[in-house]
Amino acid sequence: MIKKELPDEFGHFGPYGGMFVADTLVHALKQLEHAYTKYRNDQDFLSELHTELKDYVGRPNPLYHAVHLSKKIGGAQIYLKREDLNHTGAHKINNTIGQALLAKRMGKTRVIAETGAGQHGVATATVAAKFGFQCVVYMGSEDIKRQSSNVYRMKLLGAEVVPVTSGSKTLKDALNEALRDWVSHVDDTFYIIGTVAGPHPYPQMVRDFQAIIGVEARAQHMEKTGHLPDALVACVGGGSNAIGLFYPFLNDQSVMIYGVEAGGKGIETGEHSASLIAGKPGVLHGNRTYLLCDEYGQVKDTHSVSAGLDYPGVGPEHAYLKDTGRVIYKAINDSEAMDAFRLLTHTEGIIPALESSHAVAYAIQLAKTMSKEQSIIVNLSGRGDKDMHTVAAIDGITI
């Protein structure tokens, strides 16, 4: 049985989580924790959040029965939770709206963010434009190359995009730079972290804002079928879209839950981003979790065809769920994700993000082992517009 009251008062999920940061950030984090504790059950705050999610984001989004995909595969019925239909094209806005409302109540005038695929950067720039914040987004220079359309969207929205050229020039390096910025500007700046990683209270706060995914999906599946789904599947980078779907189902023991990491070119090659499957516990970005690191504890470079899964750590609640066995974590490699991307596009006319394609790929494998009376909810965490250049390049086409 999962304890719903996690994390504890110190931000721990079992041995994971916590607040491993420089002394200069402890006060800012305590201030944030105090504000979140105050507002998370405040009716005015929750009412404003609900209104923004409904009128601005477009929630609730549908739970779509992928009839043609299910028929093509044979086996379980596949339902897609359509986070791709949100304003800005992914689940990220569920969280940035919540944190922006918190920043407003805390009197902050500037927001910063890190981004990998660019979706969190776009979602942060979007809420900054809406609420009148100055906005700076840190993004690895490698990811800037992969996600040029999202970079342009951020700039259109009025954000400054800062290229990060250190390390692997991807998400972990962008996160490092954002933390450095925050240390220097704690008084006027709110750091909008995009995933369920980072120091306490971020893993809890982001989970709570993303849990709307699972709350809606649970009610929608009950309405459509009269029962709970047999399985849930979501991709896991930092893990916010996954925990958002999983959290409201954790105590439903009849529901199998699968998190899908980026297997890259194959786990055996070392070129992947599967920290839960191939990593070990350590400390990164302010929390204890599973990491991809060498024998000296140095964080390894990672690889995935999808920029949003290209991260060497994972949210601490996922680490806890792995150890307890409540969630089973699998890896899908680049080519399997690409195959699923094409199959969903051709059968349903839905172009998924490459991140989400990892979840679709595992759901296809899983569905084949199940009966036609059973069902799987897949979190379609984002749409694939941002990935057109990557997919075209794989196909040998320049656009």
From Swiss-Prot:
The modification N6-(pyridoxal phosphate)lysine is found at K92. Pathway: Amino-acid biosynthesis; L-tryptophan biosynthesis; L-tryptophan from chorismate: step 5/5. It catalyses: (1S,2R)-1-C-(indol-3-yl)glycerol 3-phosphate + L-serine = D-glyceraldehyde 3-phosphate + L-tryptophan + H2O. Pfam families: PALP. It is an enzyme of class 4 (lyase). Keywords: Amino-acid biosynthesis, Aromatic amino acid biosynthesis, Lyase, Pyridoxal phosphate, Tryptophan biosynthesis. InterPro entries: Trp_synth_b_CS, Trp_synth_beta, Trp_synth_beta/beta-like, TrpB-like_PALP, TrpB-like_PALP_sf. Tetramer of two alpha and two beta chains. NCBIfam families: trpB. Belongs to the TrpB family. This is Tryptophan synthase beta chain. It comes from Legionella pneumophila subsp. pneumophila (strain Philadelphia 1 / ATCC 33152 / DSM 7513). The gene is trpB.
